[in-house]
Amino acid sequence: MRRSGDWVAGVFRPPWWEALGATLLFALAAFAWVVWLGGLSVGWDTLNHHVYLGWMAVEGGRLNQDVFAAGSMSCQYPYAYGPLYWLQAHGATGVQAALVLALPAVGAAPAVWLIAWSLFPRRGGTAGLVRFAWAALAFLSPLWWSLLDSTSNDIASSLPMIWAFALVLWRGACDLEARECDPGGAAVLQGSGPWMAAAGAMVALALAVKISQAFAALGVLVVAVATAPRWSTIGLRVLAFGAGGVAAALLVWWPWAKQTWESCGSPIYPMLADQLRPWVGHLP
């Protein structure tokens, strides 16, 4: 068993310079890719509702003025499309818009690296190369590269979800190492609460942007429970996770969901519309 002060220099203190280096390399690759492609590709979804939703995000909701201007997609959470509309309104070129919209993909790089660090928290050149290889492998998915030149909100919704996974896994590694190397590390164990709350908030943000992230949200919760160092800490983790999620949902999602419920009959329209319409007293 190591001394109580030795483990502080372990998994608790990731070499962020290494994460920064990996992020810069991934950023260069992503930006070079969108420049080589020649900018954004404009598909049917872009013309049907992406620009319209971005307009609502920037100029204000229009659910009480327009009658399903983009069909059922008119009720989709619009704020992830705000940058797209703003760039278009200010005359950005296709390449400039693609570079800006690729930023969430770049922001996922340090989160993926943190996941690799949590699983392999060793220092040294060889360990760093192993983590970089793991992170690079994660970004080799053709789907990820295909989304870089699109206006889809998939990457924007995936960014907070990936960070939620990273924070939960990292704090789980911290707590497990604290229990193993320093039985008196109660302060460290108690310090995971804010991180679990932050992870819950990020999950709520991802769900607000794209409800199909629900399955990934369950995965984050499973990781949070599975990495708890003691049975007694599971309840605290779940409570902090839920509190962070509810707070973020009330702040970020509920104002728009309330408008959607009142105008379209469901806060997650078109799902549950028939069941929830009677609660607002009219059939839109």
Located regions from the model:
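Specific aromatic-rich, kink-prone transmembrane helix
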Residues: 111-114, 136-146, 156-179, 184, ...
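Transmembrane signal-anchor helices characteristic of membrane glycosylation enzymes that use polyprenol
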Residues: 17-44, 140-142, 243-261
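Membrane-interface alpha helices of multi-pass inner-membrane proteins
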Residues: 188, 195-211, 217-222, 251, ...
